[in-house]
């Protein structure tokens, strides 16, 4: 976090903390590291994590905060400099809508995501192992 204060870092892409979870997590981490007030002038508030990723990938900013799952889709354009531990687990819910026109297909997809093969596909993309609600 302290590296964000370096003179070589002019812009930091961050999902707007007012409405993006990633932005709130990042702001809280920077506040905890006592760098938020120093780097706040460098912050470029963006609409979402993918936009922050794009800003870093196309070098519009020198740094940015994204979820590991997003950084994993551009390994040739971005490098993960640090992983920020969170005090609260980040969850990715999956569900079928009540009015689904294809409930059987939706249930099969959910089953696949929860299966060993589905988890094997998701693991390299930084998705945590599926915690099944029983």
Indicate where each model-derived feature is located:
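Exported/periplasmic ABC-transporter solute-binding proteins
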Residues: 1-134
